[in-house]
Structures are given as structure tokens and as C-alpha cells.
Amino acid sequence: MTLHAQQISLSIGKKQILKDVTFAARAGALSAIVGPNGSGKSTLLKALVAELPSEGQISLNGRLLQDYAAWELASLRGVLPQAAHLAFPFTVLEVVRLGLMAGPEAQNTRLPFEALARVDLEGYAGRSYQELSGGEQQRVQLARVLAQVGAPMREGQPCWLFLDEPVSSLDIAHQLTVMDIARQFADGGGGVVAVMHDLNLTAMYADHVHVMTGGETAGAGTVADVLTDQRLSEVYGCDLRIGKVPADAAVFVLPQTARA
């Protein structure tokens, strides 16, 4: 089963943000979208989940998005937004329960607590969401998404996580916790699409990388094929070098000097 988007274009006002982008991700894999600020990463993710209207075709698990009922999509995919702010005075538990409202597990009282435990927030259920730090709010939102989709597979179909910069507000320990959760979800047969800024975390966890620049695709493929010195240096406008850890040949990205 796959996610497939073909010739996606999107404009806001008179400004074109995405230009004929084709994107593919498969269930059982973690696909990362990377690129510099303003390259169209988050806009592409929003187009993939139909949060923003776009030209082109998008299919999920073999069906066009428009052929799904809203409740079907809610049970198959969870979306973690970049901004975690909520204007209402919810408790943490109430926020996580929002993820259950549209699905078959709406009355499941156990799932929200299990989801909070997975993101290291046991004991936070009764706390005010607005009083949490940005990183804690980000983890609460991930718990909401996990409660919504449940397991990586449902009735023989893969479920999907769409994560917009899921570790941007987190310390290194919780970055690894969140990426481990995403990796485990993919290893369990689900699909994960994540907008990432950290190229080293991308190299550690991703199976597939899609590089964006100027609203267009600059490369797509495996970590080894896509994360190259030349491509990254051109896309990011600075001198980047790819190295490998001797013990296991894992790829890492090492910045050199900024371009003059």
C-alpha cells in the first residue's frame, strides 16, 4: 500500500508555492521531507492530507483521497501540525481524547493514557495544556495522533502518520523518543511521512528522503542516494559533507564553512 501524489501544484494568492511535485511513500517505511526554510516542505505535507487545496491527484492505500468519507480518513491517518497552540482551556487528557472523537475507539478510556505513556507524559492527564512548555505540548499532540490511529494496521490496511517537524521543540532525549515511536510505527507496517529539519536524524531514521527547494523536488530516493555532498550543498547553500560511521556505515552530515 502506498501514498502517491502526482503533479501537485499549489498557489496562495498569486504566489506559487508548489510546482508539479510528485511524491511517493510506502507503508512499512518512514519517508522524510527535507529542505531549507521556505522550500515548500510543510505546504507539501498539508497538500498530502488535503488541508490545503491543490492541483493534481493524491491517492492513499490505492484510493483517491476524494473517494474517502471523512470518518474513513480519520481512522486511517493522524496529522501532527507544526504549531501546537490551542485557544481553549483543555486538560491534557481532553486534548488526547480529541483524537478519538471521529473513530471507532471513541469510548475507549484506556487508549489516551497508553498514548501519553508512550511519549513520557504519564501523570500529565489532569494538567492544563496551556501551562505546558512547547515541547510538552508537542508530545501531547503526538499522543493525540497515536490515540487516533491506534495500531499501524487496521482491518488489513496500513494506517499513516503525517508529522510536521515532530521534534522541533524537543531536547535530544525526547527527539529520539519521538523518532523511535515513528520508526516502530513504520516497522509495524504503517506509513510515516515526516517533515524534518535535522539531516542527521533523517539519516538515522528515514528509509526514503524527498528533498524540496523552491517549491520543487530536488531529489528523491534512499538516504544513500539522496543525501550527497553536492545535492545538499546546492540545496542548503552551504558546504556540507557526508560521512559514515566506521562501525556500521551509518550516514551523517557534517557542515563545513559557509559559502562566501
From Swiss-Prot:
Gene3D superfamilies: P-loop containing nucleotide triphosphate hydrolases (3.40.50.300)
InterPro entries named among the record's database cross-references: AAA+_ATPase (IPR003593), ABC_transporter-like_ATP-bd (IPR003439), ABC_transporter-like_CS (IPR017871), P-loop_NTPase (IPR027417)
GO cellular-component term (any): plasma membrane
Topological type in the membrane: Peripheral membrane protein
SUPFAM superfamilies per the UniProt record, alphabetical: P-loop containing nucleoside triphosphate hydrolases
Subunit field text: The complex is composed of two ATP-binding proteins (HmuV), two transmembrane proteins (HmuU) and a solute-binding protein (HmuT).
Official protein name in the record: Hemin import ATP-binding protein HmuV
Protein source organism: Ruegeria sp. (strain TM1040)
